[in-house]
UniProtKB/Swiss-Prot annotation:
Other remarks in the entry: In A.calidoustus, the austinoid gene cluster lies on a contiguous DNA region, while clusters from E.nidulans and P.brasilianum are split in their respective genomes. Genetic rearrangements provoked variability among the clusters and E.nidulans produces the least number of austionoid derivatives with the end products austinol and dehydroaustinol, while P.brasilianum can produce until acetoxydehydroaustin, and A.calidoustus produces the highest number of identified derivatives.
Name of protein: MFS-type transporter ausY
Compositionally biased tracts (Basic and acidic residues): 49-58
UniProt organism field: Emericella nidulans (strain FGSC A4 / ATCC 38163 / CBS 112.46 / NRRL 194 / M139)
Coiled coil regions, renumbered to chain: none
Gene3D superfamilies for the chain: MFS general substrate transporter like domains, Multidrug resistance protein D
Similarity field: Belongs to the major facilitator superfamily. TCR/Tet family.
Functional summary from the UniProt entry: MFS-type transporter; part of the gene cluster B that mediates the biosynthesis of austinol and dehydroaustinol, two fungal meroterpenoids.
Record keywords: Membrane, Transmembrane, Transmembrane helix, Transport
Amino acid sequence: MQSSLLGRMTGVTGSRSKRHTKFRLRRLQQPPTESTTRLASPDDAQPIEETKSQEHLEQSATQGLSEASGDNNAGGAHPTPAPNEGDAPTVAELQHGSNDRVDDGTSGSGTVSGWKLAAVLIGLSLAVFCMSLDSTVLSTAIPKITAEFNSLHDMAWYVSAYNLTISSFSLVYGKIYSLYRVKWVYLTTLFLFEAGSLVCGAAPSSLALIIGRAIAGVGGAGVFLGSMLIVHEIMPLHQVPLFIALISGLYGIASVVGPLLGGVFTDYVSWRWCFYINLPIGGLTAFIIVLFVRPRVREKATVKKTPWAQLLDLDPLGIILILPAVMCMLLVLQWGGAKYAWSNWRIIVLLVMAGSLALTFTAVQLWQGERATIPPRIVRNRSVWGAIAFSVCIYGSFTVFTYYLPIWFQAIKSVSATRSGVMNLPMILGVVVCSMLSGWGVSRVGYYVPFMYMAPVVGSIGAGLLTTLHVFSGPAAWITYQLLLGVGIGSGMALPLVAVQTALPTDDVSTGSAIITFTQSLSGALFNFVAQSVFQSRLVHNLNAALPGVDTARVADVSPREIRNAIEPEYLPQTLEAYSLAITQVFYAGTALCTLALFGVLPIKCLSVKGSRIPPMAHA
């Protein structure tokens, strides 16, 4: 009887011990609180470390399991084998769920390696190159297109329809990519880009060509952003900067190759091949992505929702507001002072609409919170708004010099548009090579902030030297100055995306990347307009000062190549001096922007890409 009673008492004790252990394990599986986890400030959105209380709870749980096992054995139960060290759940696993390990920065569920990784990177690079090529390839083909369609009045829309939709849809895709699997969204946008290219190539009229360009722009915005996000998912974090640098370099190459390739197609085949060339390349990229990329399941997509709830998650009100706001602003920048006077009612209406829609969009984003296209907490992250400021300044400066250095060569050195592009190669090559080197350096060292400081320091020296160009400047001067500028800008151009992808939780990377790409494209359009306004005003002023009593209006209105035909030979030296001075005065704006980029680096946190990735929803 005593033996039986002792056995029942031991069984009760073992049951209580197991129930107590399960209770403690349930406590560990609950979301972390202030007593278990210390979080960084909201602007960092990054977990720091687990406290000693977590270690104590984990040890208690393990001890409880041992006690329960011992009690069961005492009661005559079968012994429970001790778990292997590798099988024991960590605190991070207990907090996030046993099937949701925190990414250690070296691998992920979709990691690709070896020749498969090389194939994916080549496919993505080709797609991005085609997308960026479409921005410049028509510059030499437009005369042939307008002659075929008899559509000189539509000439500006062949370029604008593409650029407008790319800029407008960048933020929209940031939201879509954050909610759905990157692989399938990317393939959809690639299909849109290819469909738009097909429409352009087969266009029977000018209107069809414009529509095709708009469709291609809608897809192109998603292709660029999606390429960055696929790389973020399939590669270790410390290798991502190298590919992002490659993409930035491809943009520089496309700006030079585009006009040359467009001229070759137009002269020897047909202008339609400017678009048909995208079809086989896009098909190859799609085949590679389908075959080798495994999409990561996003945490936000794991919760089953009704179709109405899914629609609300897309922030339809924000999308309805931001698309026309961006389009109105870009039309103002394109038409103001060029096609229409600033006092024209069309420009005034567009300005009012752009401002009103932008203010309403901001209010909606604050009201929507986590459902917003741009959640306010992401913008409050100091690394994000620092990267935004840096991008605006660096891309604005790059735009100024990219557009106006060729004009200086054409006007002052009397070379063709093609030749001026070749003479602009020192800056472009400097950007491409140093962009790659900085990406490699970040991958090796781990820290991107030092390279970002290098951009405004070296770049502003080269930009400042370019303001000293004059009519008699030789190749030694303009080649050296361009190289310095290219080295500076290239060393930091790709790194705002790296900073954002490192500083944000995984599920916020798409939104953060979209914000950066949007500000880059918008700053390019904005400062191109600023440069144009400075150039036109200073050119008229300089010509009037150099040639008093001479009608200088016709000189100010002609293309750079036609200056020598628009003025009498005896006035040509003064005219060239005035023209050169006006362009170098534009370079002052580019120099100021490059210098101001330094202040964008200051708030960016000096994190390492070799550290752990921030787990999804670490900001909660």
